[in-house]
Structures are given as structure tokens and as C-alpha cells.
């Protein structure tokens, strides 16, 4: 069974999440100014992302996930590391799911056991 990009994105992507990211970035601009004037010289976005993820783990407030996404995006745009690069990796180099298995892998395992 193949799925179209439209079907995949309808089920497994959130435009509402991206809109919340945009709203938060806009509000942050009015509070703090241009991001490229702050990152990475005055603050490191990846450190902010780690702090917000820790807050999410404590509070389960999904607003922190919006913050994490924005800080990760800012780190992508304005990296703290001078040697930062984008290098796509194949599945064999992926670190995978943290202590878990995907539904697809589970079902493939069941099929192989039959």
C-alpha cells in the first residue's frame, strides 16, 4: 500500500503546530529583537532547546514543544558550532527511536514470524 505525500502529511504533520511556531517567533521578535543579532554570539539556541525539553518532561505543557521546535530551527539557521553542517544520513546510520520500535517495524516482525 502506497500513500501519497498529501495523505502522509494530512495524518503525520501538523500545520497548526507550525502556525504556533510562527506566532511564537513573531512574539519573540517583539520581545527580544532580531534572532540573528542574538544567536549564536549572545545565546546558543540548542542550549535553550534542551532547557525547554526538560521543562516539558517536568510539566507536560506542550507549549514547551513549540519553543523546542523554534530553538532547534534557530540553531539550524544560526548554529553555535562553526563546523555545523547538514549531512543527510541513510537508515543504517540513523540512531533510530529511543528505546522503541516503530509500528511498521513491529508489523514487519509479525509478518516474518508467520
Feature annotation, model-predicted:
Residues 1-114:
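Flexible "arm" and connector segments at domain edges
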Amino acid at each position: 500500500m502506497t500513500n501519497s505525500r498529501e495523505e502522509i502529511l494530512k495524518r503525520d504533520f501538523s500545520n497548526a503546530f507550525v502556525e504556533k511556531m510562527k506566532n511564537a517567533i513573531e512574539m519573540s521578535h517583539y520581545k527580544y529583537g532580531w534572532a540573528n543579532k542574538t544567536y549564536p554570539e549572545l545565546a546558543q539556541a540548542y542550549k535553550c532547546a534542551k532547557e525547554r525539553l526538560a521543562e516539558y518532561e517536568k510539566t507536560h505543557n506542550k507549549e514547551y514543544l513549540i519553543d523546542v521546535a523554534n530553538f532547534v530551527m534557530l540553531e539550524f539557521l544560526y548554529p553555535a558550532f562553526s563546523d555545523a553542517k547538514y549531512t543527510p544520513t541513510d537508515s543504517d546510520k540513523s540512531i533510530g527511536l529511543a528505546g522503541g520500535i516503530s509500528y511498521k517495524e513491529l508489523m514487519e516482525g509479525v509478518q516474518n514470524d508467520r
